[in-house]
């Protein structure tokens, strides 16, 4: 049930009955509202029946339902309160008035199964308000109420057990279970769906409700009474999946461990490996959602420490579900294809960053550089074929004085005669074969990922996929036009040249300095520039029409920039981009309105809108620059996964070591050696920079360098000094520096070092 307001009212006695209600609490169903006689916009509806009228009525009903979901829910909750006050039985259950409830239940005419506006019974209301005494009276009088679900669209399927569980009323849960309440009942109402406007998602079963609210006692009670920990909701999510989606990470980790302790060995597959309808296990879902706390918690359960030697620790990390080798839906691919920015933070976690670094340095970067070099040579070959395309002098007479064409395309029979033509033919065949290979490589990925994900994800190179596929089609169109002797091959050839060379920017993602800039360009084009083009089109249409009207009566020979409407549009576009200056002829008098209109156009277009575009692009650059390393790391992962799928296995061996060598089965592991004292010198520099008093923490830093750094908490106590009384701006600056210092110290002392993609010696990988 929804969040109802608890109103302070006097206890309901035997005579205190709502006005207009029967003393026995019989509740009558309200009449359904009548259809409106008029359309919401004021149009009367015809009375004749027919297909058009039926469609019209459906459209009107659909238009009526386009109100806010939250507003509809609020109205139903208000109606629910009204119905409760109109029904003595429901009101007694709400007020926990056991005496009045007993009197009402003794009347033969009392309908104990009556329902409120949400389809709730009196037992639902008693459970909602934690009224244990009223609930016991109702269950004694009508035990079947325990099994009754709510019937409204919002709360369909919810039983009293669901409500008692979510309120953490342990005594009521015990009473309901003792009377046979179903532990497998499913709450399928729209309130319980996983939607953006829903504030909670607790699944559908009472067990998932109990796990999400963090009640360990209720979880144990439900499991003891037969609750299935492997039960899945309509989305295929188990209780472990649902815990991943909860905001309270601490309770989620505790409940996760508790539920796994009940997962016996009578199943072939562990509960952690049960996928939902999207094929995601709880571990993969944690990565896709960017739940770092749960991801680290699960990784702690999957790692095996080999040995510890002072500050050195050798750890084996299980790569199951992480590595893209042998997994069509690996965690690496899921992270780079999701739209959630938080998921990219998983790429900075151990062992994901080490695995990505290992793959990129060993195989990804060399193969990607070779692929880029091959493509550049290929596009140069295609360019040379276009530059030296077969042409011959034009022999037809020119009738149009403005036509200055001198050469024309050769026929197919004349195009391949000389040895120079044969050499060009080899290049053309290479270009055609390359275009076919591009289509064969790209099209399968479209069907595998879907059109939206393949072309819409910037990290995957979405716009570049559009460019390269369009380029390949233009090459094939040029070939067809050449074979059929159709004039105009210059059109697809020109498009192919522009697109082919623009696609060279795709290979900039292999370099940390250039990769993020390609994303900036994409975001500016498809974000800032697209929005700006709408405004620019409106301004150009308005002023071009004005210029055309002004010069409509003038001699076009003296000033022909706005002679006809298409020319006026093009000239205004050039003026907007300041490609040309304002047209003027000082030998004749120009219309006065031209000067006024052009002055307004110059102010709006040049001074206002162009500077607005520059400001928008600057803001986009600032936002992307703050995510530069994160975006480049995601580009590296996407490129690595792409190359791994395309190349044969003999050219890309699997990374890691097989668990059979360590008695860990057939799973693959990555061994990471962590040295926590690598950044001690950098810590000392930070500490000296922020030192403000004598030797409060320098003695600790001068201790034996072999001593193991445990946590940052003791250093935080030594390095926290009282802030002197200074101005507000100085205090704010000091606070920010303090946060920076604390963050740097605590991060380094924990041994969490972001060196997954650097060339330094911060991490060592031994395979």
Swiss-Prot record:
Q: What induces it?
A: Up-regulated in intestine by exposure to a low-calcium diet. Down-regulated in intestine in response to a high-calcium diet.
Q: Which reaction does it catalyse?
A: Ca(2+)(in) = Ca(2+)(out)
- ANK repeat windows: 84-114, 118-147, 156-185, 202-231, 235-276, 278-307
Question: What membrane topology does this protein have?
Answer: Multi-pass membrane protein
PROSITE patterns per record: ANK_REP_REGION, ANK_REPEAT
> Which gene does this sequence derive from?
Trpv6
The protein depicted here goes by the name Transient receptor potential cation channel subfamily V member 6
Per the UniProt entry, what species is this protein from, by scientific name?
Mus musculus (Mouse)
Q: Give the top-rank taxon of the lineage listed in the UniProt record for this protein.
A: Eukaryota
Question: Which SUPFAM superfamilies does the entry mention?
Answer: Ankyrin repeat
Per the record, its GO cellular-component terms are:
calcium channel complex; membrane; plasma membrane
């Amino acid at each position: 049930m929804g969040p109802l307001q608890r109103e302070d009212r006097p206890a309901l006695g035997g005579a205190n009955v709502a006005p207009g209600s029967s003393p026995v609490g019989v509740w009558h169903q309200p009449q359904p509202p009548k259809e409106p006689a008029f359309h919401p916009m004021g149009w009367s509806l015809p009375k004749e029946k027919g297909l058009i009228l039926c469609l019209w009525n459906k459209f009107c009903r659909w238009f009526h339902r386009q109100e806010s979901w939250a507003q509809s829910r609020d109205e139903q909750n208000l109606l629910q309160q009204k119905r409760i006050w109109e029904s003595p039985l429901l009101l007694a259950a709400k007020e926990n008035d056991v005496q009045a409830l007993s009197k009402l239940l003794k009347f033969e005419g009392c309908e104990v199964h009556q329902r409120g506006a949400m389809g709730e019974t009196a037992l639902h209301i008693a459970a909602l308000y934690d009224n244990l005494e009223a609930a016991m009276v109702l269950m004694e009088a009508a035990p079947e109420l325990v099994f009754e679900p709510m019937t409204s669209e919002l709360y369909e399927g919810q039983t009293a057990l669901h409500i008692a569980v979510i309120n953490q009323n342990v005594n009521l849960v015990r009473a309901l279970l003792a009377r046979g309440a179903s532990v497998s009942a499913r709450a399928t109402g729209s309130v319980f769906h996983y939607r953006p406007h829903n504030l909670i998602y607790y699944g559908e079963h009472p067990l998932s409700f109990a796990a999400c609210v963090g009640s360990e006692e209720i979880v144990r009670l439900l499991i003891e009474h037969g609750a299935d920990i492997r039960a899945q909701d309509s989305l295929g999510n188990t209780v472990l999946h649902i815990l991943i989606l909860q905001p309270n990470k601490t309770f989620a980790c505790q409940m996760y461990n508790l539920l796994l302790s009940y997962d016996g060995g009578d199943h072939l597959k562990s509960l952690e490996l049960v996928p939902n309808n999207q094929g995601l296990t709880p571990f993969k879902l944690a990565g896709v959602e960017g739940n770092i706390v749960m991801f680290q918690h699960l990784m702690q359960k999957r790692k095996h420490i080999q040995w510890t030697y002072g500050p050195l620790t050798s750890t084996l990390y299980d790569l199951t579900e992480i590595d893209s080798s042998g997994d069509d839906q690996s965690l690496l691919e899921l992270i780079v294809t999701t739209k959630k920015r938080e998921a990219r933070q998983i790429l900075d976690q151990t062992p994901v960053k080490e695995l990505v670094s290992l793959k990129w340095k060993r195989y990804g970067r060399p193969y990607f550089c070779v692929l880029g070099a091959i493509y550049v040579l290929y596009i140069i070959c295609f360019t040379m074929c276009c530059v030296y395309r077969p042409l011959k002098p034009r022999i037809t007479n020119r009738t149009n004085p403005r036509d200055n064409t001198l050469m024309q395309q050769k026929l197919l029979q004349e195009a391949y005669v000389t040895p120079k033509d044969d050499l060009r033919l080899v290049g053309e065949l290479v270009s055609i074969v390359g275009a076919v290979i591009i289509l064969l490589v790209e099209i399968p990925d479209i069907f595998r990922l879907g059109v939206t994900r393949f072309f819409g994800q910037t990290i995957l190179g979405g716009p570049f996929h559009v460019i390269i596929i369009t380029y390949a089609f233009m090459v094939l169109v040029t070939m067809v036009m050449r074979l059929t002797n159709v004039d105009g091959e210059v059109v697809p050839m020109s498009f192919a040249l522009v697109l082919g060379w623009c696609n060279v920017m795709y290979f900039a993602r292999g370099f940390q300095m250039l990769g993020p800039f390609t994303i900036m360009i994409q975001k500016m084009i498809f974000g800032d520039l697209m929005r700006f083009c709408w405004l620019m089109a409106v301004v150009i249409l308005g002023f071009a029409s004005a210029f055309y009207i002004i010069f409509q009566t003038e001699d076009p020979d003296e000033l022909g920039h706005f002679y006809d409407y298409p020319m006026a549009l093009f000239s205004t576009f050039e003026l907007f981009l300041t490609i040309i200056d304002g047209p003027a002829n000082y030998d004749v008098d120009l219309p006065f309105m031209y000067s006024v209109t052009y002055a307004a156009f110059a102010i709006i277009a040049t001074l206002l809108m162009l500077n607005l575009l520059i400001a928008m692009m600057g803001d986009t650059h600032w936002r992307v620059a703050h995510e530069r390393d994160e975006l480049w790391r995601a580009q590296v992962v996407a490129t690595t996964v792409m190359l791994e799928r395309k190349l044969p296995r003999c050219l890309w061996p699997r990374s890691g070591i097989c668990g059979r060598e360590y008695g860990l089965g057939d799973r693959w592991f990555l061994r990471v050696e962590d040295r926590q004292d690598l950044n001690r010198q950098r810590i000392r520099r930070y500490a000296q920079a922020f030192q403000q008093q004598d030797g409060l923490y320098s003695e600790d830093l001068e201790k034996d360098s072999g001593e193991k750094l445990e946590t940052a908490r003791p250093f935080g106590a030594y390095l926290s000094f009282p802030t002197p009384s200074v101005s507000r701006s100085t205090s704010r600056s000091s606070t920010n520096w303090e946060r920076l210092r604390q963050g740097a110290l605590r991060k380094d002392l924990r041994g969490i070092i972001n060196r997954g993609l650097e060339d330094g010696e911060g991490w060592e990988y031994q395979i």
